[in-house]
C-alpha cells in the first residue's frame, strides 16, 4: 500500500458485473403498461376501467380498524338486503365475497345504500342488440352511455369537526386508553371467567 488512497474493501463475487441489475427497460415498461391499460379498456367496454364495485370496509387490527378502505366483495347478506341476486351481481359489475361477514348494522346499511346507488346509476346493455330483455336499459340511455374512466363512487372520508373546550377535573380523571384496554381484556377473558364461575358453582353444590 502506497500513498493516501482508499484501502480496497470490495467484497464482490467473481464476475459480479454479469449480475448487475439494470433499469434500462423502465421507460419501455411504462409504455407497455399504458398500452395494456388502453387495450383492456377497449376490451371491457362499456364496463368501467377500474373494475367491479367493491364495498367500504374497516381495516383489521387495533392499528387500522378506525380507517375505512375498499374491501374484496359484498357479502351475501348485503346483496339480499339490496335486492340483488347473488348470481346476477358479478354479471353487472359487483364484486361478491361469500366469506366476509357483517359484524355491524352500520356497515351493512352503508354498503346496502352503496349498492342501491350503484344500481340506480347502472346502464345495462342487452346481450343481443335486437333482443331486449326486462331489466335492460332504454335505447336513449344506451346512446348516452360512456365508459367510466378511473375511480367511481370513491370513499368519502368524513372529517369530524373539533371544538375547543376547557379541561375540567372530571375530564382529567377519565383515562380513555386505560378504559378501552380494560374492556378489551374483559372481553378476552369473558369465556374463561364464565367457565370458572360455573365450575365454582358446581363445587359449591357438591
UniProtKB/Swiss-Prot annotation:
Compositionally biased, Basic and acidic residues: which spans? Answer: 196-206
Against InterPro entries, the record matches this protein to: Ribosomal_eL13, Ribosomal_eL13_CS
Q: Where is the composition biased (Basic residues)?
A: 186-195
Domain of life (superkingdom): Eukaryota
Q: Name one Pfam family in it.
A: Ribosomal_L13e
Q: What are the protein's UniProt keywords? A: Ribonucleoprotein, Ribosomal protein
Q: What PROSITE patterns does its record include?
A: RIBOSOMAL_L13E
Q: Which cysteines are joined by disulfide bonds?
A: none
List, in alphabetical order, the Gene Ontology terms for molecular function in this entry.
Answer: structural constituent of ribosome
| GO biological process, alphabetically ordered | translation
What are the start and end residues of every segment in region (Disordered)?
183-206
Sorted alphabetically, the Gene Ontology cellular component annotations on this record are: ribonucleoprotein complex; ribosome
UniProt lists the family membership as follows:
Belongs to the eukaryotic ribosomal protein eL13 family.
Recorded hits in PANTHER family, A to Z, give: 60S RIBOSOMAL PROTEIN L13
Q: What is this protein called?
A: Large ribosomal subunit protein eL13z
Amino acid at each position: 500500500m502506497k500513498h493516501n488512497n482508499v484501502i480496497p474493501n470490495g467484497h464482490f463475487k467473481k464476475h459480479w458485473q454479469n449480475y448487475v441489475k439494470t433499469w434500462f427497460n423502465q421507460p419501455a415498461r411504462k409504455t407497455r403498461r399504458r398500452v395494456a391499460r388502453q387495450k383492456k379498456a377497449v376490451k371491457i367496454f362499456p364496463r368501467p376501467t377500474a373494475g367491479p364495485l367493491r364495498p367500504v370496509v374497516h381495516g383489521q387490527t387495533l392499528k387500522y380498524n378506525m380507517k375505512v378502505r375498499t374491501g374484496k366483495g359484498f357479502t351475501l347478506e348485503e346483496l339480499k338486503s339490496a335486492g340483488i341476486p347473488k348470481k346476477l351481481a358479478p354479471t353487472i359489475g359487483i364484486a361478491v365475497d361469500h366469506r366476509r361477514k357483517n359484524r355491524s348494522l352500520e356497515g351493512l346499511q352503508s354498503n346496502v345504500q352503496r349498492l342501491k346507488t350503484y344500481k340506480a346509476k347502472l346502464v345495462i346493455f342487452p346481450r343481443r342488440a335486437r333482443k331486449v330483455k326486462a331489466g335492460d336499459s332504454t335505447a336513449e340511455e344506451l346512446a348516452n352511455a360512456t365508459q367510466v374512466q378511473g375511480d367511481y363512487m370513491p370513499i368519502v372520508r368524513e372529517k369530524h369537526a373539533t371544538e375547543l373546550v376547557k379541561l375540567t377535573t372530571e375530564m382529567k380523571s377519565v383515562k380513555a386508553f386505560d378504559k378501552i384496554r380494560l374492556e378489551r381484556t374483559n372481553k378476552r377473558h369473558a369465556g374463561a371467567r364464565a367457565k370458572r364461575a360455573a365450575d365454582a358453582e358446581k363445587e359449591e353444590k357438591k
